Amino acid sequence: MNRKNIIGIPIKNLKEPMSRLDSTLDKNQRISLQIGLIKNLAECFRSKDNDIFLISNDSEIEKLANQLEINFFNAKSVGLNKEVIEFSKNFKNYQGWMICHSDLPYVTKYFAKTIIQEIEGSEILIAKSKDSGTPFIAGSISFDEFRFGVKSFDKHSKYLKENKFEYKQIY
């Protein structure tokens, strides 16, 4: 373990990214936007203390990781939750971990630094989106019960409460 934190950014592929915007942006615009958001995440979290990984089983995502000079986790599993659970086996090698959606538009270097500091003092940090999704979840303890999908924040928080994890909701 050379670095303190591991950050995973799951992304299926670039074939139909951000499909919820298909009535506003054409496919090439959505691909450019998705790549731009991933680049921003990589730059904001890039530091001597963080190992950043794109999580996927798509060769185009591996090429993108190489272009961005970040790590690639080649998931053997299929499906977001299974891929992230597989990736989470690496958490034990780090003091802190974070799973972050690949399309977060509001991340800045200040935000990234603040989140990393918050991880150090928390078992679990979790964010809730307007649609009750989980744009990011992070922590300093072993965790592998990811429940992304519809109303994932509600599923995560229910699991955390039932299993008596201390967690802090931010944002």
Residue ranges and their predicted role:
Residues V107-S132:
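Conserved donor-nucleotide/metal-binding helix-loop-beta segment in metal-dependent transferases, i.e.
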Residues S32-N50:
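A short, N-terminal amphipathic alpha-helix
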Residues L21-Q29:
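Short glycine-enriched, charge-decorated loop/helix-capping segments at active-site entrances
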Residues N66-M98:
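Short phosphate-binding loop-to-helix
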Residues H101-P105:
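The conserved acidic donor/metal-binding loop of glycosyltransferases
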Residues I141-Y171:
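Active-site oxyanion/phosphate-handling segment shared across diverse enzymes
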Residues M1-L21:
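N-terminal nucleotide-binding beta1-loop-alpha1 segment
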Residues D49-N71:
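Acidic donor-binding segment of Leloir-type glycosyltransferases
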